[in-house]
């Protein structure tokens, strides 16, 4: 059985480390489209990270409500990623991450997994790293 973990992240800059992931949402579905669970969390900024000016300008002009929502119930990246890891491990194996744009979201999620979960996960919790939401037809889901 394949579990598709459809993820969406918001970040305050173009790359992890100098900037922070501010929120992560995911919904897990099987091949038939049955929802298996969902997850969402908002993160406190990384220590010494700073929001990128052009990213913050985009948020304030295009998605101010998303930016405000991301400031609610924030947790540390370590705590948040441990919660995400716990949730992922409840899902049936052969987990495939899906997102759009997949390379951007996967870069952030993988960096946070490697940085905050490497000590407790034996492997990245996705069988296939990712596919882009625009490629769904190719996967026949």
Protein language model features and the residues they cover:
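Substrate-recognition/cap helix-loop segment adjacent to the acidic, metal-dependent catalytic center
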Residues: 88, 103-130
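Short alpha-helix plus adjacent loop in nuclease-associated cores
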Residues: 126-141
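A ubiquitous, low-specificity "background" feature that marks scattered single residues
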Residues: 36, 74, 111, 138-141
């Amino acid at each position: 059985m394949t579990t598709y973990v459809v993820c969406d992240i918001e970040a305050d800059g173009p790359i992890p480390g100098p900037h922070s992931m501010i929120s992560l949402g995911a919904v897990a579905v099987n091949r038939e489209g049955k929802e298996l669970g969902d997850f969402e969390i908002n993160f406190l900024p990384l220590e010494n990270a700073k929001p990128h000016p052009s990213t913050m300008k985009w948020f304030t002009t295009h998605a101010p409500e998303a930016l405000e929502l991301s400031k609610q119930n924030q947790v540390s990246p370590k705590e948040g990623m441990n919660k995400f890891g716990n949730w992922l491990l409840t899902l049936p194996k052969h987990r495939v991450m899906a997102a759009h744009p997949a390379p951007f979201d996967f870069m952030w999620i993988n960096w946070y997994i490697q940085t905050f979960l490497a000590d407790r996960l034996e492997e990245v919790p996705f069988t296939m790293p990712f596919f882009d939401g625009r490629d769904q037809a190719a996967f026949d889901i």
